Structures are given as C-alpha cells and as structure tokens.
C-alpha cells in the first residue's frame, strides 16, 4: 500500500481576511452566478466584519465589467485585463487569480459551479494546499471565520456540512 501523509502548516487566521469572488465573464458579460455569490458573501461578511472583494480576468472590456459590480456592495475589484486573457485558458487564469489570492490573503474564495469554475477552482485549491467544497447549496460563517459549506452527498439523500478549519483560504 502507498501511504501519503501531509501535515497542515501552521497558520494564523487573523492574517486571512475578507471574501474574494471570482467573476466569470461569458460573451463579454458578467455571468449571473457572480451576483448570486456576491449576495451570499455580503450576508456572511456582515456577520464577521469582512469586505467582499472580486477578481475579474479577461481581455478587452474587463475593466468596464468590473465597474458594474460596485453598486452590488462589492468593496474592491481586482482587474486582470490583457489581450492574452481573451478566451479562457485554465492555467493562465489560475495564475492571475492565484496572484490576487497571494497578494490579498482572503479568508474565503467563492467560485461559481459552472464549467469554467469547475476547471479553475481545483487548480487554485491545489496551489494553496487547502480544501475545496464543490456544489455548495448553502453557505454560512461562524464567528471564528470558518465557513459552513453545505452540499448534497450520497446521491442527494443527505446534506453534508463541511468546514475547512486548518488552512486558508477556504474554497467553495
């Protein structure tokens, strides 16, 4: 049998603050899932005093789309606009979002459960050696900033509550 043991590195939760939402663009427009994630993050942010920030990656027109998010209660939008980001390429987008995460150290990163999000999220959680809960149906947050992530399990017969307590950022 092959054994693999990995111990979590010590970290300080106080170093990791706020929410970061990946903003997906589709045909030059912000994907509707982004607004759903902003709403959920706003609810949780109010409980722990966090900001709701976004990161958007794309080609021409990305900065203009970023400005559309501000009326929805987003505190900051980090924009990665470059002709090289025309069309989704998972590794290039993961590099940009990972740069934003490393620079800002969000406690939680929310990514929509779209085809693009399902490609991007595992790449990012692997880079940061932390957990990812896919297909969440409910999100909440504890006073200690651990997210409670609820998702269907065993063919939808039960709802599993999942928490990432020993690493940051938390991906959902």
Identify the meaning behind each predicted range:
Residues 1-172:
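N-terminal glycine-rich FAD/FM-binding segment characteristic of electron-transfer flavoproteins
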């Amino acid at each position: 049998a092959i054994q693999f043991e990995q111990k979590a590195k010590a970290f300080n939760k106080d170093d990791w603050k706020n929410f970061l939402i990946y903003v997906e663009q589709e045909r030059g427009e912000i994907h509707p899932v982004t607004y759903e994630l902003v709403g959920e993050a706003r609810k949780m942010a109010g409980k722990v005093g966090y900001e709701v920030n976004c990161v958007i990656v794309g080609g021409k027109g990305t900065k203009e789309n970023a400005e559309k998010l501000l009326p929805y209660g987003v505190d900051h939008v980090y924009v990665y606009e470059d002709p090289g980001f025309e069309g989704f390429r998972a590794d290039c987008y993961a590099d940009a979002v990972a740069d934003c995460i490393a620079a800002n150290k969000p406690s939680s990163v929310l990514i929509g459960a779209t085809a693009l999000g399902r490609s991007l999220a595992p790449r990012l959680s692997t880079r940061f050696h932390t957990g990812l809960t896919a297909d969440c149906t409910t999100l909440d947050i504890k006073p200690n900033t651990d997210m409670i992530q609820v998702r269907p399990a065993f063919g939808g017969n039960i709802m599993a509550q999942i928490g990432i307590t020993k690493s940051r950022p938390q991906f959902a």
